[in-house]
């Protein structure tokens, strides 16, 4: 960031100080512009950037940043000139031109390489001028004329020294030492005059002057006339000019001449030949040797020095005075009275005739050494409020009328023309005029608070403001000897550096809480919201000091502005006019700001280092266009990559998402700082706060569409344009629309697969469930069947048991019957009678009917036995089968015998035979075998 230095002169001794109000001076040191000390030529391109031919090459300044471009051979740049935005430079054995590339950086094209090396050898270019399509490069022995259309050279040589070349209108003039003044006609040199002035003295500049010329020489002063009729320029400054060793000279836009000298700084001479300013190192320049002079488009005058660069704003409405030696001190109050300017400082009261002249001298009013607080004229008498008391100043002499410590202010009392109320460190006091002279009368008892700010509500009622204790309303007795009532005004918020002042018969109170107006009816302070909003809008509170102006205006001081509150022309509503003069430039005495308006709009502002004057109505704010200077991108922790500015839209990889933007406005007057606002659409839509920082960096931007916007403000003038740059950060390949479509398709496919898998799974599950259900049903069915079977078996078992019981009963019946019949038969046999009965008995014993009935029952109970038996033993006889049936019923031989109508022994024999037929082993039981079948 450039360093601004604002300097003024102070030479003298205690009690008398030379006063010279100087224009603002801005100094740039070699360490700031990163070059060497000497600066040989200066120019300005169409884009308003300033360029310097420096020992290290070409310097570029855009109002914010310095950039250095070395010449290809590392030579000193002696000359620079701009045509549009093309810069032509020249140095030792080298000249060519520079043009900005797409990155807004200058690229060099050498023209001297088109020449025969012998033509340029040992030549050093000192000046470059343009004429139609030709560019003329002047060295000390040659002029190289370059045709930009045909790209060809023509060379004019000089036997002797060729110091300068000039363009007057469409004519080209140049000087050859020992030969005279020449003119180019159709590309040929023509001698204009061989006057001794041109043969023997170096011509620094040739300037048109109505129908003749001004000839500025290095060491013979200035002449006027035609080339053939020359005479000295006879003006008031001629004698001074004739003593100067002039190295550079330029005419400014107002017609004045600026002469750069060796060892004596710079002189500004009016068109009439009057000395306007003389600036040298003690006035603030960095060096007294001025190598080059240039007036830019905003009328700032640049000085290329033997050591550094200075910029002087001769046309500024501001003039500065700075007390470097500390003799004058900090200015707390000022006033013009009876043709004299008085300055009250921390070191005394000083005076000088007014208006100020270049040779004005400040003198100390004897006896006023120390802190002066206030200067005020009451009834044409000048009162001086001093740390030592109160003085009346007459004819530059001080007369003490009160020796009480610390007089802040004095005010007239309505209805009492011979009384003045005085505020002191310890309350209020009364001054009285007796026999035409003012004197101290009494202290007003009952109030001992320091009374720096006080205003009358009525002749005996007033308000007193103290920044730490608040605002008090005091009621005085009619004799002004004591305070009868003290009321603390709670409606007035306390605040640092707060103060009250009267404006158009109304009392105003200014604090960091806002601007308040006192209502005499309700005895309340009411905030003026409209004025408070205007005062504090994008501004910072600095001090509540309010100063009465010339036209009943009221001056206030904020962090960034001096504000004038004045009545509206068409209504009674107060209007605010702001002058963007920052506190850092003003060098305010915060809380003790003082501004004296000696004429409407003409102001003198006291500062901590002296004072400044300005014409408020002449302070204008030129709008400047803002430009994006450079754009760089980078990856995380990667190197910066310059971005072309001529690209309407550019896309970046998602990993290249860090961006740095640099911007500027070509405003070089540091009186009003350049501030910037930016926003990045696509990230956020609101503007940033105003800031002097001219670079912004964005890191880790997400993929998206962005537009960077920046605007500037110089003073109160916002740039008419908004510079912009549009760019896109591409999404990573895996987040592109194609990939997103692929992901959607893949997701749909996956969903479809999942759906299908689910359907298959569902079907399988359903089938499994169905199978399990079927199995369960089958099991249930089996269980039911088993139950039914069990029931059926139980029924069958019951039936079998029933049949068995029936069979057993039948068997037993048959057995009993046969036994009975056998008994009967035996009885009959033993009696020998009854053959017929025997026959009946035998028929009943061998009754087939009984057997068939028995067999039917047996088959119902044991259906398969006979089948198995016959299958295993097919050779069994019916009697054998009958025996097997009886054995199946587990009947003994004894029980079987009656059934077969044979003896028990016969049964045993049958059993034996049956065993043999069945091929049973000896140890195998016949009954068990039959039961197991």
Mark where each language-model region is:
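Carboxylate-rich, polar loop motifs that coordinate divalent cations or form catalytic acidic clusters
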Residues: 1-730, 736-737, 742-755
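Cytosolic signal-transmission helices at domain junctions
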Residues: 319-323, 739, 752-822
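Phosphate/oxyanion-binding loops and surfaces in catalytic or ligand/nucleic-acid-binding neighborhoods
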Residues: 614, 634, 757, 817, ...
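Cytosolic nucleotide-binding catalytic cores of signal-transduction proteins
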Residues: 647-649, 664-730, 821-822, 829, ...
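PAS-family sensory domains
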Residues: 332-333, 798, 867
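Short, compositionally biased low-complexity segments
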Residues: 179, 792-799, 827-836
